[in-house]
Regions:
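Post-signal-peptide N-terminal segment of Sec-exported extracytoplasmic proteins
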Residues: 36-69
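Solvent-exposed, acidic/flexible segments
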Residues: 43, 47, 51, 91-92, ...
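N-terminal export leaders
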Residues: 1-8
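Bacterial Sec signal peptide processing site at the extreme N-terminus
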Residues: 10-33
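Acidic/histidine-rich, surface-exposed loop or edge segments in extracytoplasmic proteins
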Residues: 31-42, 127-130
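C-terminal/domain-edge helix-coil "capping" segments
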Residues: 133-167
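Surface-exposed short loop/turn segments
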Residues: 61-67, 71-115, 121-137
Length: 167
């Protein structure tokens, strides 16, 4: 009975057109489209981290002759939380937000206009070096998370082949 239910479920999924986004692996439609996205230089250390993470995930070299261009603007905030009795900060929150646009390089049309972001908590300890290292690690992790979010939305847009901006 279970086998029959699984078979019926598989047939139902097949008939609705559901398929993996990365069907075809490196030779699939999405992989080819992602490899044709250039990522211009993004200002600052956080920009360098996000751009490198995007290039790694897109499978591109950041070439300028690509069909699509991904313009990214970042907002990186570090704010103190949790004041102790002696007015020192016990915890910080690092927030990295990205506003990005996927632009068709051929006609300048904006295909996707969206945001991505994440935040991380950092404990402030008595060692200044340890706190700085924790802040840096948080930034590196946030850059990867934001890049993953951007690539997921760009992949969906390129897979759908839409030609209008969406959020």
């Amino acid at each position: 009975m279970k086998r029959l239910a699984v078979l019926c479920g598989a047939l139902a999924l097949d008939s609705c057109g559901l398929q993996p986004m990365y069907a075809g692996g490196g030779n699939g439609i999405v992989a080819h489209a992602l490899a044709d996205v250039s990522v211009p230089v993004i200002a600052g250390q956080q920009g360098w981290l996000v751009r490198n993470a995007l290039i790694d995930r897109l499978g591109t070299s950041g070439q300028s002759s690509a069909r699509y261009r991904l313009d990214v603007r970042l907002d990186d905030k570090l704010e103190g939380l949790g004041l102790l009795g002696n007015d020192t900060i016990a915890r910080e929150r690092r927030t990295l937000r990205a506003r990005y646009q996927l632009v068709d390089s051929q006609d300048g049309k904006i295909l996707l206009d969206a945001t991505a972001g994440s935040d991380a908590g950092v404990d402030v300890v008595s060692s200044e070096y340890a706190t700085i290292a924790a802040e840096q690690t948080a930034l590196e992790n946030l850059a990867r998370v934001v890049a993953d979010q951007i690539v997921a939305k760009v992949s969906l847009r390129l897979r759908s082949g839409g030609s209008t901006a969406s959020q």
